[in-house]
Amino acid sequence: MAKEKPILNVAFIGHVDAGKSTTVGRLLLDGGAIDPQLIVRLRKEAEEKGKAGFEFAYVMDGLKEERERGVTIDVAHKKFPTAKYEVTIVDCPGHRDFIKNMITGASQADAAILVVNVDDAKSGIQPQTREHVFLSRTLGISQLAVAINKMDTVNFSEADYNEMKKMLGDQLLKMVGFNPANITFVPVASLHGDNVFKKSDRTPWYNGPTLAEVIDAFQPPEKPTTLPLRLPIQDVYSITGVGTVPVGRVETGIIKPGDKVIFEPAGAVGEIKTVEMHHEQLPSAEPGDNIGFNVRGVGKKDIKRGDVLGHTTNPPTVAADFTAQIVVLQHPSVMTVGYTPVFHAHTAQIACTFMELQKKLNPATGEVLEENPDFLKAGDAAIVKLMPTKPLVMESVKEIPQLGRFAIRDMGMTVAAGMAIQVTAKNK
């Protein structure tokens, strides 16, 4: 059997009206991942609903409600092959109330494609576009390319394309720490397929790669196998004749039968008997693998979702408190010392209290604007000290980035996102 192509997870980010879903649908169609007949059927459905041009978007917008509203709600995953990779698309929603999905979606991505509407050069960069790029950067995505879409609406004008490219570079990418010189920009018309998989003859002035070629130029992710083992528990099952079977995704390190392990903050210690993925026993599992495993010496009641597994020689850090850099995405009032919202970190959901507001930062450059601010409001970035109200595993992003990022939820919305820059371990 031919060796399988490596998998590359690519997030599609940007404002809701930039044509992300259409770009993705076009990649899937031209990449041979969907039947052309499906597009014909969806085109008819779109036209009947007065949404002509939405047929490609419908491929990703599988949920009926999304089709009627024309927005992408949940994070959808679809695959297509390129010359080099098996690409899994993480189509991230654009609407503000779905930023939580964006946070959980983007954190699974190896690279991101920012889709923008060429016409935004006239109206300015959309706030959502800024937020998505900033979040991707905060969530550790270092590879980015830009698709400047809807080129057909400006008659494939090179001047309009260059204006948009310059505006993005000067007003957004540089500010969040991307070097525009290292980013590939592609002029596309996704609805018609120009420069998506196939070179367009309508952009004779452009001699760069197509969007599919840009994806092939991304570097494959390096699996963090040399970092300490960290496996956040998603669920715990008790299987007759087998025993306790926790399941979760290996974030860092390697797990294999015979390993002596500890679950934190539960403190339960055991030995790995077997490791399974897709009902097959594995000699070992590595980062990215979703596994079930059997542990000797640990009962179902001893551990729960939100616990993190590590080796007894290097146990996960239970935080007494931690200092974090956060960005406030939205908040109806202000955040002050004493505020205690729920933190979503790996698989845990634990309320944490704001103990100190240490510095307010310029969200785009990171420079300090104010020491010890009295409050934080929407749009602010800050360094804060936090204390979990119950035991929580948190690692510093410098040491184990996969376990140092979090979203902060309150009142049914994601109010902030951030990363732990320093963690004080709880004394046992």
From Swiss-Prot:
<keyword id="KW-0460">Magnesium</keyword>
<dbReference type="InterPro" id="IPR029459">
    <property type="entry name" value="EFTU-type"/>
</dbReference>
<dbReference type="GO" id="GO:0005737">
    <property type="term" value="C:cytoplasm"/>
</dbReference>
<dbReference type="GO" id="GO:0005525">
    <property type="term" value="F:GTP binding"/>
</dbReference>
<keyword id="KW-0342">GTP-binding</keyword>
<dbReference type="Pfam" id="PF00009">
    <property type="entry name" value="GTP_EFTU"/>
</dbReference>
<dbReference type="Pfam" id="PF22594">
    <property type="entry name" value="GTP-eEF1A_C"/>
</dbReference>
<dbReference type="InterPro" id="IPR009000">
    <property type="entry name" value="Transl_B-barrel_sf"/>
</dbReference>
<dbReference type="Pfam" id="PF03144">
    <property type="entry name" value="GTP_EFTU_D2"/>
</dbReference>
<keyword id="KW-0547">Nucleotide-binding</keyword>
<dbReference type="InterPro" id="IPR004161">
    <property type="entry name" value="EFTu-like_2"/>
</dbReference>
<dbReference type="InterPro" id="IPR031157">
    <property type="entry name" value="G_TR_CS"/>
</dbReference>
<feature type="binding site">
    <location>
        <begin position="14"/>
        <end position="21"/>
    </location>
    <ligand>
        <name>GTP</name>
    </ligand>
</feature>
<keyword id="KW-0648">Protein biosynthesis</keyword>
<comment type="similarity">
    <text>Belongs to the TRAFAC class translation factor GTPase superfamily. Classic translation factor GTPase family. EF-Tu/EF-1A subfamily.</text>
</comment>
<dbReference type="InterPro" id="IPR000795">
    <property type="entry name" value="T_Tr_GTP-bd_dom"/>
</dbReference>
<dbReference type="InterPro" id="IPR009001">
    <property type="entry name" value="Transl_elong_EF1A/Init_IF2_C"/>
</dbReference>
<protein>
    <recommendedName>
        <fullName>Elongation factor 1-alpha</fullName>
        <ecNumber>3.6.5.3</ecNumber>
    </recommendedName>
</protein>
<keyword id="KW-0251">Elongation factor</keyword>
<keyword id="KW-0963">Cytoplasm</keyword>
<feature type="binding site">
    <location>
        <begin position="91"/>
        <end position="95"/>
    </location>
    <ligand>
        <name>GTP</name>
    </ligand>
</feature>
<feature type="domain" description="tr-type G">
    <location>
        <begin position="5"/>
        <end position="225"/>
    </location>
</feature>
<feature type="binding site">
    <location>
        <begin position="149"/>
        <end position="152"/>
    </location>
    <ligand>
        <name>GTP</name>
    </ligand>
</feature>
<dbReference type="InterPro" id="IPR027417">
    <property type="entry name" value="P-loop_NTPase"/>
</dbReference>
<comment type="function">
    <text>GTP hydrolase that promotes the GTP-dependent binding of aminoacyl-tRNA to the A-site of ribosomes during protein biosynthesis.</text>
</comment>
<dbReference type="InterPro" id="IPR054696">
    <property type="entry name" value="GTP-eEF1A_C"/>
</dbReference>
<dbReference type="GO" id="GO:0003924">
    <property type="term" value="F:GTPase activity"/>
</dbReference>
<feature type="region of interest" description="G4">
    <location>
        <begin position="149"/>
        <end position="152"/>
    </location>
</feature>
<feature type="region of interest" description="G1">
    <location>
        <begin position="14"/>
        <end position="21"/>
    </location>
</feature>
<dbReference type="Pfam" id="PF14578">
    <property type="entry name" value="GTP_EFTU_D4"/>
</dbReference>
<dbReference type="GO" id="GO:0003746">
    <property type="term" value="F:translation elongation factor activity"/>
</dbReference>
<dbReference type="InterPro" id="IPR050100">
    <property type="entry name" value="TRAFAC_GTPase_members"/>
</dbReference>
<dbReference type="InterPro" id="IPR005225">
    <property type="entry name" value="Small_GTP-bd"/>
</dbReference>
<keyword id="KW-0479">Metal-binding</keyword>
<keyword id="KW-0378">Hydrolase</keyword>
<dbReference type="InterPro" id="IPR004539">
    <property type="entry name" value="Transl_elong_EF1A_euk/arc"/>
</dbReference>
<feature type="region of interest" description="G2">
    <location>
        <begin position="70"/>
        <end position="74"/>
    </location>
</feature>
<feature type="region of interest" description="G5">
    <location>
        <begin position="189"/>
        <end position="191"/>
    </location>
</feature>
<feature type="region of interest" description="G3">
    <location>
        <begin position="91"/>
        <end position="94"/>
    </location>
</feature>
<feature type="binding site">
    <location>
        <position position="21"/>
    </location>
    <ligand>
        <name>Mg(2+)</name>
    </ligand>
</feature>
